Structures are given as structure tokens and as C-alpha cells.
């Protein structure tokens, strides 16, 4: 299982939110590129980026910070937040992102996901953010009646590289991941599923790994708070 350290970008800074609330942002640094380089130096295989302003605005907002990160690191990076059309997808992939994450648009325009996955094989992921099993969009501000598992299954034949499943109520709360829901989603589809939201300790990571169904896990606040030791986590996952 791959550990994806998270860099959430708000106003050019590295922050973490509590359950997706922009007003509940904790600033962890003003040099996201240096943070990405530190994750790479520690041995991370990937870096997970989120343009928080972009998720709410529906267009890229923290482009300068993302480009600075891409210029600093050699490991692959994936980005979500505000990516809602083919032009933006193509632009980011040309700029050096390994993978784009489509969230809101996966609900509102699933045909775009299929088109992008065909055009850029292996480089398009779907972000499914859910509260009590129901998908939320537009930076989690809008709740839908779409069930997370149904949305995941609808992309089974689309060629998407991964599904990033976030349990909103666990995100940034240090409350532990929703292992049962994530495992159930991962077993419902053949697409690799990456868990996000609530990873707060090494035990959480190992519990996700031990399901045998989950391909990766994203962690942010726990790494910044020191609750999860990155070196120890990487060693444990490779053991």
C-alpha cells in the first residue's frame, strides 16, 4: 500500500482543514514546494496535492504553488480541486502532473471523466467525497443523493487510474479512517481505491493495509502534527 502525503493549498500556503470547512484552516507552512521536497527526501513515492481555493472556485487558483512544487520534486504528484474541463486537464498534465483528480465533474459530467481517461490513459483519477455514504461536491459544500458506491461502479469500465475515497466527517479530525466503508467500496470495484480522511496513526495505516483491498492512503494533518512519523510509516508499509 502506498502512502500519499497531502499538501492542501489555500492562498498559496500549506494548510489543513477540519471536515472541509475553509474557516477551520490551520496553516502549516508558507512554502509548499519545500514541504513537497521534504516528503520526497523522506522516501515518499507520491505527493497528493489539493487546490482548496480551486475546489470552491471551480477553476485552478493555486497554480503558482503547484508549479513550484512540480519544479522541486522528481516523484509523481496528483492534484485535485477545480479541474472541471478538458483544457485544464491537458494543461496540468503537460505541466508535469502525473495524475489529475476529478471530483465534482465526475458527478455533474461523467462523460468528461470517460473522455479524459481515454485521452490520458493512467493519468485520470476520480475523487469521491462522501458524508454518510452520499457524495458531496463543490468543495464538499453541496450534498447530493448519489451513493458513493454507485458512483464508483459507474466508472468501472471507464479506464480511470484510481478512486480517491474521502470520508468527509473523518477528514482532518484525527478520528481514524472509516475503514469499513472504504474497504466495502474497494471490494465493490476493480479500480484501485485510495483512502483519505482521518488517518491519524500508524495503527490506522496498518489497519487500512490489512484489509487487503485498499491500494493507498492519504495523510495530511497526522504528518504535520507529528502523530504519524513518516519514516516509521514508510518502513512499516514496506516491511
From Swiss-Prot:
<keyword id="KW-0413">Isomerase</keyword>
<dbReference type="InterPro" id="IPR006063">
    <property type="entry name" value="HisA_bact_arch"/>
</dbReference>
<keyword id="KW-0368">Histidine biosynthesis</keyword>
<dbReference type="GO" id="GO:0003949">
    <property type="term" value="F:1-(5-phosphoribosyl)-5-[(5-phosphoribosylamino)methylideneamino]imidazole-4-carboxamide isomerase activity"/>
</dbReference>
<dbReference type="InterPro" id="IPR011060">
    <property type="entry name" value="RibuloseP-bd_barrel"/>
</dbReference>
<feature type="active site" description="Proton acceptor">
    <location>
        <position position="8"/>
    </location>
</feature>
<comment type="similarity">
    <text>Belongs to the HisA/HisF family.</text>
</comment>
<dbReference type="InterPro" id="IPR044524">
    <property type="entry name" value="Isoase_HisA-like"/>
</dbReference>
<dbReference type="GO" id="GO:0000162">
    <property type="term" value="P:L-tryptophan biosynthetic process"/>
</dbReference>
<dbReference type="InterPro" id="IPR006062">
    <property type="entry name" value="His_biosynth"/>
</dbReference>
<dbReference type="GO" id="GO:0005737">
    <property type="term" value="C:cytoplasm"/>
</dbReference>
<dbReference type="Pfam" id="PF00977">
    <property type="entry name" value="His_biosynth"/>
</dbReference>
<feature type="active site" description="Proton donor">
    <location>
        <position position="129"/>
    </location>
</feature>
<dbReference type="InterPro" id="IPR023016">
    <property type="entry name" value="Isoase_HisA-like_bact"/>
</dbReference>
<keyword id="KW-0963">Cytoplasm</keyword>
<comment type="pathway">
    <text>Amino-acid biosynthesis; L-histidine biosynthesis; L-histidine from 5-phospho-alpha-D-ribose 1-diphosphate: step 4/9.</text>
</comment>
<dbReference type="InterPro" id="IPR013785">
    <property type="entry name" value="Aldolase_TIM"/>
</dbReference>
<dbReference type="GO" id="GO:0000105">
    <property type="term" value="P:L-histidine biosynthetic process"/>
</dbReference>
<keyword id="KW-0028">Amino-acid biosynthesis</keyword>
<protein>
    <recommendedName>
        <fullName>1-(5-phosphoribosyl)-5-[(5-phosphoribosylamino)methylideneamino] imidazole-4-carboxamide isomerase</fullName>
        <ecNumber>5.3.1.16</ecNumber>
    </recommendedName>
</protein>
Amino acid at each position: 500500500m502506498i502512502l500519499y502525503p497531502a499538501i492542501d493549498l489555500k492562498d498559496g500556503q500549506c494548510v489543513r482543514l477540519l471536515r472541509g470547512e475553509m474557516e477551520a484552516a490551520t496553516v502549516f507552512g508558507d512554502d509548499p514546494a519545500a514541504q513537497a521536497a521534504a516528503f520526497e527526501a523522506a522516501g515518499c513515492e507520491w505527493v497528493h496535492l489539493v487546490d482548496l481555493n480551486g475546489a470552491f472556485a471551480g477553476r485552478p487558483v493555486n497554480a503558482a504553488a503547484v508549479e513550484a512544487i512540480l519544479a522541486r520534486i522528481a516523484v509523481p504528484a496528483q492534484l485535485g480541486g477545480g479541474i472541471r474541463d478538458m483544457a485544464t486537464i491537458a494543461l496540468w498534465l503537460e505541466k508535469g502532473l502525473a495524475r489529475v483528480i476529478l471530483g465534482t465533474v465526475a458527478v455533474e459530467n461523467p462523460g468528461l471523466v470517460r473522455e479524459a481517461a481515454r485521452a490520458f490513459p493512467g493519468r485520470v483519477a476520480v475523487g469521491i467525497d462522501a458524508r454518510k455514504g452520499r457524495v458531496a461536491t463543490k468543495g464538499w459544500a453541496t450534498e447530493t443523493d448519489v451513493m458513493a458506491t454507485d458512483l464508483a461502479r459507474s466508472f468501472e469500465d471507464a479506464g480511470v487510474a484510481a478512486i480517491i475515497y474521502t470520508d468527509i466527517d473523518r477528514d482532518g479530525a484525527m478520528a481514524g479512517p472509516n475503514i469499513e466503508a472504504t474497504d466495502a467500496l474497494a471490494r465493490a470495484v476493480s479500480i484501485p481505491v485510495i483512502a483519505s480522511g482521518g488517518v491519524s496513526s500508524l495503527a490506522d495505516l496498518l489497519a487500512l493495509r490489512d484489509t487487503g483491498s485498499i491500494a493507498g492512503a492519504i495523510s495530511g494533518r497526522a504528518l504535520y502534527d507529528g502523530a504519524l512519523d513518516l519514516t516509521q510509516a514508510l518502513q512499516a508499509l514496506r516491511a
